[in-house]
Amino acid sequence: MATVNQLVRKPRTPKVEKTNVPALNACPQKRGVCTRVYTTTPKKPNSALRKVARVRLTNGFEVTSYIGGEGHNLQEHSVILIRGGRVKDLPGVRYHTVRGALDCAGVTSRRQGRSKYGAKRPKS
């Protein structure tokens, strides 16, 4: 236990919490430009071709962002919005692309969970 005099000389420092999404700078989303759109394979035991994009953000960071949903219209120089949220089986992918915002189109013919994929309500 520190004495009062020790605490006067050197106060207690609060613990600094490390963020999982440093490129967002405590913002909910960030805008960026795709520098490369490609597919990559997940860690064992999963097998697939996951769609990802390398994105240069407005704050200068260059990050890898996952493109969720079936099919996308992204290519190099597309302007997209990214949010936090890692992909567990893709090492180094800590961000998700927001579907239906800026240049990224929503998922077509999506019926359930539409808000997560930027899909409009279908005409019944």
From Swiss-Prot:
Cellular component terms per the entry's GO annotation: small ribosomal subunit
Q: Which Gene Ontology terms describe the biological processes this protein takes part in?
A: translation
SS bond list: none
Task: Fetch the Pfam families from UniProt.
Answer: Ribosom_S12_S23 (PF00164)
Q: Which UniProt keywords apply?
A: Methylation, Ribonucleoprotein, Ribosomal protein, RNA-binding, rRNA-binding, tRNA-binding
Q: Which residues carry this modification: 3-methylthioaspartic acid?
A: 89
Superkingdom classification of source: Bacteria
GO MF annotation terms: rRNA binding; structural constituent of ribosome; tRNA binding
- Xref: PROSITE patterns: RIBOSOMAL_S12 (PS00055)
- Which HAMAP family does UniProt cross-reference here? Ribosomal_uS12_B
Q: How the protein assembles, per its UniProt entry?
A: Part of the 30S ribosomal subunit. Contacts proteins S8 and S17. May interact with IF1 in the 30S initiation complex.
Q: Its biological function?
A: With S4 and S5 plays an important role in translational accuracy. Interacts with and stabilizes bases of the 16S rRNA that are involved in tRNA selection in the A site and with the mRNA backbone. Located at the interface of the 30S and 50S subunits, it traverses the body of the 30S subunit contacting proteins on the other side and probably holding the rRNA structure together. The combined cluster of proteins S8, S12 and S17 appears to hold together the shoulder and platform of the 30S subunit.
**Similarity comment text for this entry:** Belongs to the universal ribosomal protein uS12 family.
Q: What is this protein called?
A: Small ribosomal subunit protein uS12
What species is given as this protein's source? Shewanella frigidimarina (strain NCIMB 400)
Q: Gene name on record?
A: rpsL
